UniProtKB/Swiss-Prot annotation:
GO MF terms held by the record: actin monomer binding
InterPro entries reported for this sequence: PFN, PFN_euk, PFN_sf, Profilin_CS
Record SUPFAM superfamilies: Profilin (actin-binding protein)
Its biological purpose: Binds to actin and affects the structure of the cytoskeleton. At high concentrations, profilin prevents the polymerization of actin, whereas it enhances it at low concentrations. By binding to PIP2, it inhibits the formation of IP3 and DG.
Sorted UniProt keywords: Actin-binding, Cytoplasm, Cytoskeleton
Name of the protein in its database record: Profilin-3
Gene3D superfamilies: Dynein light chain 2a, cytoplasmic
Homology family: Belongs to the profilin family.
Tagged with keyword Cytoplasm: yes
Primary subcellular site in the record, as a coarse category: cytoplasm
Source organism: Nicotiana tabacum (Common tobacco)
Keyword Repressor: no
Pfam family, one: Profilin
Subunit composition and interactions: Occurs in many kinds of cells as a complex with monomeric actin in a 1:1 ratio.
Length: 133
């Protein structure tokens, strides 16, 4: 299965048949290389990925400044140290799951809920960890 298939078929899913999807999703390498992405995934800066990786290595690193992706600031909210970072901005937010080799990104806007975003991002992340990725 291609990385793009994981994004298209497992991250950009229709929640409960309601026609609701994540706003954007992507799978990146730890170095910030894009393995696959949805059409609306934002153009990020390399230093933003560096800072995200630093927060996985040093949980709490992003809390004082916020998480930035494509220049957009998200307030960091509860996550799983070293495994999941979650952020909130207005009626939307972001979930990032770290695997051995990849970062799984999900961005959402209402009516999609934080829980729905967390579920799909973390589910595919856990699957990839089980597969050695």
């Amino acid at each position: 299965m291609s990385w793009q298939t994981y994004v298209d078929d497992h991250l950009m899913v229709d929640f409960e048949g309601q026609g609701q999807h994540l706003a954007a999703a992507a799978i990146l390498g730890h170095d910030g290389s894009v393995w696959a992405q949805s059409p609306h995934f934002p153009k990020f800066k390399p230093e933003e990925i560096t800072n995200i990786m630093k927060d996985f290595d040093e949980p709490g690193f992003l809390a004082p400044t916020g998480l930035f992706l494509a220049g957009i600031k998200y307030m960091v909210i509860q996550g799983e140290p070293g495994a999941v970072i979650r952020g909130k901005k207005g009626s939307g937010g972001i979930t990032i799951k770290k695997t051995n080799q990849a970062l799984i990104f999900g961005l959402y806007e209402e009516p999609v809920t934080p829980g729905q975003c967390n579920m799909v991002v973390e589910k595919i992340g856990d699957y990839l960890v089980d597969q050695g990725y």
